[in-house]
Amino acid sequence: MTEQKRPLTYRDAGVDIDAGNELVKRIAPVAKRTRRPEVLGGLGGFGALCELPTKYKNPVLVAGTDGVGTKLRLAIDHNRHEKVGVDLVAMCVNDLIVGGAEPLFFLDYYATGKLDVEIATSVVTGIGEGCELAGCALIGGETAEMPGMYEGEDYDLAGFCVGVVEKDGVLDGSKVEAGDKLIGLGASGPHSNGYSLIRRIMAQAETDIDLDGKPLIEHLLEPTRIYVKSLLKLIEQVPVHAMAHITGGGLPENLPRVLPDNTRAVIDTKSWEFPAVFQWLQQEGQVPAFEMYRTFNCGVGMVIAVPASHVDDALALLEAEGESAFLIGEIQAGDGQPDVVLDGLSA
């Protein structure tokens, strides 16, 4: 006689709808704090609605998507979930601002093997914090509980952001010319790039140490700096020719993305302090100098090209807005494809 099969539920399969509903309740106040006047409706609809701000006469929408990469593994292993949401927002909105765009709204995707409401609430609270720092609205998202796809409570994040810019205010690098000065903005740490190498180095080094009076793990999990509000003010007052978000690939890979042909960026790598966390990574991993700059931001999270006649005004404004800003190089005439020259590197 065959054993009678019992009825199965979605929860038996590993998906807890009630937990998902509880999460929505908890994050509703987070989304409310980020609300902009253009947003129509609240959370829970099939689609989120947002008007264009009326101040734009000829608006262009700018969209971007990104994740946090394997920095998540470090956060999960150390039970530090409260700031990875800031990282997620930062990686998206910093990409938008380099085109001159004001971020309007943000959506997130949270995927996990088993939904832990406390962890997810902590992550989304960080996303809300990032949206507040960037001035954009958290208007929706997706929480996917996928048993068999992720191990236990491990999770992955993705973000999507839309911004707006006047058509004649789009920054695409076409105005960059020889003689422009390059300003670097200080990074808060490795931001959200290079963590596969970081974790490899950590596996072979002593990590229970302090750097500059702060535990190493605090340096490594410091959230990515969001530059949006200070750069929006800069764009209003200074003729910015281009901006580059220094992410994976570092200065050598990201600066050429905003340079026209027949130009090159010459960077003085001694013009800013090489942060202690990168000194530690280079020493413990025996990482060659160029590989460091091709993997990490090495202390510079954003680069801005401005006419030489406006560099002092730009530096003063950025410092007044709370940024660590420094002159790091200039644009010179080149030959063919845009290039980056890193002066002052040691082997």
From Swiss-Prot:
It comes from the Bacteria. It is found in: Cytoplasm. It catalyses: 2-formamido-N(1)-(5-O-phospho-beta-D-ribosyl)acetamidine + ATP = 5-amino-1-(5-phospho-beta-D-ribosyl)imidazole + ADP + phosphate + H(+). InterPro entries: PurM-like_C_dom, PurM-like_C_sf, PurM-like_N, PurM-like_N_sf, PurM_cligase. GO terms for cellular component: cytosol. Its main location: cytoplasm. Pathway: Purine metabolism; IMP biosynthesis via de novo pathway; 5-amino-1-(5-phospho-D-ribosyl)imidazole from N(2)-formyl-N(1)-(5-phospho-D-ribosyl)glycinamide: step 2/2. One of its GO terms (molecular function) is phosphoribosylamine-glycine ligase activity. Its EC number is 6.3.3.1. GO terms for biological process: 'de novo' IMP biosynthetic process; adenine biosynthetic process. Keywords: ATP-binding, Cytoplasm, Ligase, Nucleotide-binding, Purine biosynthesis. Belongs to the AIR synthase family. HAMAP family: AIRS. This is Phosphoribosylformylglycinamidine cyclo-ligase. It comes from Alcanivorax borkumensis (strain ATCC 700651 / DSM 11573 / NCIMB 13689 / SK2). The lineage of its organism: Bacteria, Pseudomonadati, Pseudomonadota, Gammaproteobacteria, Oceanospirillales. The gene is purM.
